[in-house]
Amino acid sequence: MENPHEQVQANILSRIIGNVKRLNESVAILNQELVTINNRNKNLEIMGAICDNYHSSVQFNLEATNNKKPPL
């Protein structure tokens, strides 16, 4: 005699497996997008560091030559 709930449990398990597969696909796509965003952010981080270094260099040179003036 078969378990009367076996078919219901099999259907539920099948739905769970399908949902987990779709979830895994979505997470993989999300991870790819995050990698892309992180790569773009690296470029912005480098540009910010360049600007900070330039600002520090300009401030140092203005102070060294006594050409630094107060802000307007």
Curated annotation (Swiss-Prot):
**What would be one Gene Ontology cellular-component term for the protein?**
DASH complex
* Compartments, record wording: Nucleus; Cytoplasm, Cytoskeleton, Spindle; Chromosome, Centromere, Kinetochore
Query: Nucleus: is it a keyword of this entry?
Result: yes
Gene Ontology BP terms = attachment of spindle microtubules to kinetochore; cell division; mitotic sister chromatid biorientation; positive regulation of attachment of spindle microtubules to kinetochore; positive regulation of microtubule polymerization; protein transport along microtubule to mitotic spindle pole body
**Which UniProt key words apply to this protein?**
Acetylation, Cell cycle, Cell division, Centromere, Chromosome, Chromosome partition, Coiled coil, Cytoplasm, Cytoskeleton, Kinetochore, Microtubule, Mitosis, Nucleus
Q: What is its main location?
A: nucleus
A Pfam family:
DASH_Dad4
> Which residues span the membrane?
none
Q: Which residues form a coiled coil?
A: 19-47
Give additional notes from the record: Present with 967 molecules/cell in log phase SD medium.
The entry sums up its family as follows: Belongs to the DASH complex DAD4 family.
Its name, as the record gives it, is DASH complex subunit DAD4
